[in-house]
């Protein structure tokens, strides 16, 4: 029996941790990819803030699927030393939170450049981050993201061919669409490395983010295929369906919305319901809180 376990970036429902917990419980989601805590980036938490956040989550029975960090969202042409120190501090935060995985990226490319010119520096810097993470007992998970080295499928494959035995792969269909890549084609190339998915769908024509199954992310097809290859996998909802407080600091471009909601909470609920509709449509049923099996 294959199982999908649901997680979410609950800061899309609210910046307040207790309200994030409420949104997760309302939607039967048992895991969180923690990105923002009461208005503070998870990467900027003090020890005390991290301990307090963990206690609230533990008391509610919510576990971290991963630390949703911004590491690697850093210009490749800048000196790496400062960012490495920032990352090392993040490893400490991750351990306090009780997580053993960190979502990260492969560095922003200069506008108009040929990413191949920066490939060696990307690989070197990722290698240093892996050294630090391995020493701390934490696994790094690379996410494809518009504007970084690993924004398109072939460069994600490049990274995985070098580090795939140590580094996980997060597959984000909408981010591939926004980088001009068809998700199903990227999936075929990256399938053997995929650790888990970010559930975010989009329209190819304008990059607009839409609920799962409503765009061109091939999410039903991909989830059906993954369910035939493994035993279990985490699906992390990252709705981006309305402009919430945290998103303003994550993306420079203005998002186009084909679906609009009165509140972030309503958008979060809609995203959860859309994923559950997709899972139901490919034969899955909820067998316990936050777990869907087939």
Give the location of each predicted region.
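Histidine-acidic metal/acid-base catalytic patches
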Residues: 1-10, 14-30, 58, 152-167, ...
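Active-site beta-loop-alpha junctions enriched in small/polar residues
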Residues: 9-13, 35-37, 69-72, 107-109, ...
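Active-site acidic/histidine proton-transfer and metal-coordination neighborhood
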Residues: 16-22, 56-59, 76-168, 178, ...
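Structural motif
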Residues: 27, 35, 96-97, 192
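Residue-level detector of anion-binding/catalytic polar loops
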Residues: 30-31, 63, 100, 139, ...
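Conserved beta-strand positions in the central sheet of alpha/beta enzyme cores
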Residues: 33, 66-68, 103, 141, ...
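Glycine-rich, proline-tolerant flexible connector loops at the mouths of alpha/beta enzymes
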Residues: 33-57, 106-114, 207
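A short acidic, helix-capping loop that chelates divalent metal ions and anchors anionic groups
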Residues: 38-41, 73-77, 110-115, 178-179, ...
């Amino acid at each position: 029996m294959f199982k999908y376990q649901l997680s979410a970036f609950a800061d899309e429902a609210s910046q307040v941790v207790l309200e994030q917990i409420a949104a997760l419980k309302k939607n039967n989601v048992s895991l969180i990819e923690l990105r923002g805590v009461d208005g503070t980036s998870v990467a900027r938490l003090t020890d005390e803030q991290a301990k307090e956040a963990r206690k609230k989550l533990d008391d509610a029975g919510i576990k971290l699927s991963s630390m949703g960090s911004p590491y690697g969202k850093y210009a490749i042409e800048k000196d790496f030393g400062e960012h490495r120190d920032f990352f090392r501090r993040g490893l400490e935060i991750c351990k306090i939170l009780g997580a053993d995985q960190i979502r990260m990226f492969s560095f922003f490319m200069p506008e108009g450049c040929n990413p191949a010119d920066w490939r060696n520096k990307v690989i070197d810097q990722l290698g240093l981050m892996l050294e630090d993470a391995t020493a701390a007992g934490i696994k790094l998970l690379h996410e494809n993201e518009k504007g970084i080295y690993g924004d398109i499928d072939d460069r994600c494959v490049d990274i995985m061919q070098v580090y795939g035995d140590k580094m996980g792969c997060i597959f984000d269909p909408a981010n591939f669409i926004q980088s001009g890549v068809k998700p199903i084609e990227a999936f075929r190339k990256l399938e053997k490395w995929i650790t888990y998915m970010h559930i975010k769908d989009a329209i190819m024509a304008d990059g607009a983010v839409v609920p799962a199954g409503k765009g061109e992310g091939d999410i039903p097809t991909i989830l059906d295929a993954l369910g035939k290859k493994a035993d279990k996998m985490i699906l992390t909802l990252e709705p981006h369906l309305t402009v919430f407080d945290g998103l303003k600091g994550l993306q420079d471009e203005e998002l186009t919305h084909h679906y609009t909601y009165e509140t972030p909470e309503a958008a979060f609920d809609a995203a959860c319901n859309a994923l559950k509709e997709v899972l139901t449509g490919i034969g899955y049923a909820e067998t316990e809180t936050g777990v869907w099996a087939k």
